[in-house]
Design a protein with these regions (language model features):
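ATP-dependent adenylation/nucleotidyltransferase module used to activate substrates
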Residues: 1-143, 173, 380
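Secondary-structure junction/capping motif
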Residues: 2, 95-97, 201, 401-411
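AMP-forming adenylation/ATP pyrophosphatase catalytic core
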Residues: 9, 13-24, 29-30, 53, ...
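Bulky hydrophobic/aromatic packing residues
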Residues: 40-44, 68, 86-91, 112, ...
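Acidic, metal-coordinating catalytic cores used for nucleic-acid/nucleotide bond scission
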Residues: 61-66, 193-196, 285, 307
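Short, low-complexity, polar/charged sequence segments that are solvent-exposed and flexible
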Residues: 73-76, 103-105, 141-143, 183-185, ...
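Short, surface-exposed, polar/charged, turn-prone segments marking secondary-structure boundaries
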Residues: 80-84, 110-114, 148-152, 191-192, ...
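Flexible helical/loop "lid" subdomain adjacent to adenine-nucleotide binding pockets
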Residues: 119, 124-275
C-alpha cells in the first residue's frame, strides 16, 4: 500500500508549504476516507514538522452521533493527532438536508481553521466521490466537479482558506484495504446507504457499473489578463477580451466577478450570466445587475460594483466592531479596530458629514460606487463624525487604524484559480495601480 501513501504525499508536497509554521487542518469524520487521509497527512506533518489538527463535525442528525465523535477522537488520539469537536446546533431544515449539512460543515470547519491559524483544510474526497458527482449531475443535481485545490466554498468565513484533496485520484476500496492492512477500523454512517438522498443512489449505481459523463469545469487561467480590481473593491473586465473567450469561461468569470464585487455568498445562476453575455455583442453601452452587482459596460470595460439599491432590500446592514475584534462588513471589507468600538455602515446618506480629506478621497471614486463604500463611526462619542474607511486611493489603498481591507482582490484571484498552492495564499497582486477606466470622473459631484 506504499503506492497509495506516496500518491497522497505527492499532492501534499506539491500543494503545501513545507516551510510554513501554520497548522494543517484535516476534516475527520471517522470514516474510512478521512481516516486514510489522516494517515497520509500524519506522514507529511512528521516529515515537515508541521502540526496536524483534526476537525470533527457532529451534525446531530443521528442518535449515536455523540458516540461517533468519541470514537473519532479516540482514533485520532491513537494516531497522535489532536482533535477539535464541532457541533451543528439549532433547527434543521425539513428539506434540502444534505446541502444544509454540507454548508454547516464547511462553515464550522472554516471558522475553526481560522481560529487555529490554518490556511489549508485537507478533505478526504476520493475518485469515487468524483464519479458519484458525475452521476448526480446527470440526474439534475446542481453539483460541480471536485478539485484537488480550491478555495473554501463558504463566504466570508472561508476567506483566505483553501481545501486540498490529496486522495482525489484514488479509489475508496483501495484505501479501505490499506486501512485494514494497518489494523485500523472506521465508522460507517448509515446515511451513506439511505436511498432517499441523491449521493447514496449514485453510490449504488456506481457499484453496479453505471458511469456518468465527466464534469468539466472551465479553466479561467487563459483569462488572467482580462480583469483588474479597482481600488475601492470593484472589478473591471476587458470587454473585447471577454467577447473572444470561450462561452463557458466567460460565463464563469462573470459569475465570479459579480460575487466578488457584491460580497454575495454564492454565484449568480448561469442563465443570468449568459443573459449578460448576450448583451456584449457589438460595443453598445449598457447597465445591468447580476448577483447583487451593478455592471456598467462601455466600449472598453465592464465594471462591477456593489449594487447600492440593495439597501432597500435589507443589504448593506451596519455592524458593530468591538475593540480588538475583526469582522467582515457586507462580505467585501475586513474591518479591524484596536482601540475603540466602531459602527460600520454604508456611506449613503452620510457623505455630507465627511471631512475635507475624506471628501477628497470620495471624489476619486466612481459616482455609482460611492453609496456602498464603508464609513466608520466611533461609539465612544455620541456625535462622532463618519470617517471614510478607505483613506487613500492613489496608486493603491492606504489604511489607517482602524484598518479596512478590501477582500475582492484575493477572493477573485482564488476563485479564478490563480492561487495554486499554500505558499501563494494572499500573495497575488492584481490591484489596478494605473487603471482609471473612463467611468471614473474625478471631482464629480456626490
Amino acid at each position: 500500500m506504499d503506492g497509495l501513501q506516496s500518491a497522497a504525499l505527492e499532492v501534499l508536497e506539491r500543494r503545501l508549504d513545507a516551510r510554513s509554521s501554520a497548522p494543517i487542518a484535516v476534516a475527520f469524520s471517522g470514516g474510512g476516507d478521512s481516516l486514510a487521509l489522516m494517515l497520509a497527512a500524519r506522514g507529511f506533518a512528521r516529515q515537515t514538522r508541521r502540526k496536524l489538527v483534526a476537525l470533527h463535525v457532529d451534525h446531530g442528525l443521528q442518535p449515536p452521533s455523540a458516540a461517533w465523535a468519541d470514537q473519532a477522537e479516540a482514533t485520532a488520539a491513537r494516531l497522535g493527532v489532536p482533535l477539535v469537536r464541532l457541533a451543528w446546533t439549532g433547527p434543521k431544515p425539513s428539506s434540502g438536508l444534505p446541502a444544509a449539512a454540507r454548508e454547516a460543515r464547511h462553515r464550522l470547519i472554516a471558522e475553526a481553521s481560522r481560529s487555529l491559524g490554518a490556511r489549508v483544510v485537507l478533505i478526504g474526497h476520493t475518485l469515487d466521490d468524483q464519479l458519484e458527482n458525475a452521476l448526480m449531475r446527470g440526474a439534475g443535481a446542481p453539483v460541480g466537479a471536485l478539485r484537488e485545490w480550491a478555495p473554501s466554498p463558504v463566504w466570508p468565513q472561508g476567506r483566505g482558506l483553501f481545501l486540498c484533496r490529496p486522495l482525489l485520484a484514488l479509489r475508496r476500496a483501495d484505501l479501505r484495504a490499506w486501512l485494514a492492512d494497518e489494523g485500523l477500523g472506521w465508522l460507517d454512517d448509515p446515511a451513506n446507504a439511505d436511498l432517499r438522498y441523491a449521493r447514496p443512489r449514485a453510490r449504488l449505481a456506481l457499484a453496479e457499473g453505471v458511469h456518468g459523463a465527466p464534469i468539466l469545469e472551465p479553466d479561467l487561467s487563459p483569462l488572467a489578463d482580462l480583469w483588474r480590481v479597482t481600488p475601492w473593491g470593484g472589478v473591471a473586465i476587458d470587454r473585447r477580451g471577454l467577447q473572444r473567450a470561450a462561452p463557458d469561461q466567460a460565463v464563469r468569470l462573470l459569475q465570479i466577478a459579480a460575487a466578488c464585487a457584491s460580497g454575495a455568498q454564492g454565484l449568480a445562476r448561469p442563465g443570468r450570466a449568459r443573459g449578460v453575455m448576450a448583451r456584449l455583442t457589438g460595443d453598445k453601452a449598457f447597465v445591468v445587475t447580476l448577483g447583487g452587482a451593478r455592471i456598467a459596460a462601455d466600449v472598453d470595460w465592464m465594471t462591477f460594483e456593489r449594487e447600492a439599491g440593495e439597501m432597500e432590500r435589507g443589504g448593506l446592514a451596519p455592524i458593530t466592531v468591538e475593540a480588538g475584534q475583526t469582522r467582515v462588513w457586507d462580505g467585501r471589507f475586513e474591518i479591524t479596530t484596536a482601540a475603540a468600538d466602531l459602527r460600520v455602515e454604508a456611506l449613503r446618506g452620510h457623505a455630507a458629514g465627511l471631512g475635507d480629506a475624506d471628501r477628497a478621497v470620495m471624489l476619486g471614486v466612481a459616482v455609482s460606487a460611492r453609496p456602498a463604500l464603508p464609513v466608520f463611526r466611533t461609539l465612544d462619542h455620541e456625535r462622532a463624525a463618519p470617517r471614510l474607511a478607505l483613506r487613500g486611493l492613489r496608486a493603491h489603498i492606504e489604511f489607517e487604524s482602524p484598518s479596512c481591507r478590501p477582500l475582492c482582490e484575493d477572493r477573485l484571484a482564488a476563485a479564478a484559480g490563480m492561487t495554486t498552492r499554500e505558499a501563494e495564499i494572499g500573495t497575488i497582486a492584481r490591484m489596478a495601480k494605473s487603471l482609471r477606466p473612463p467611468y471614473v470622473k474625478a471631482g464629480s459631484k456626490d
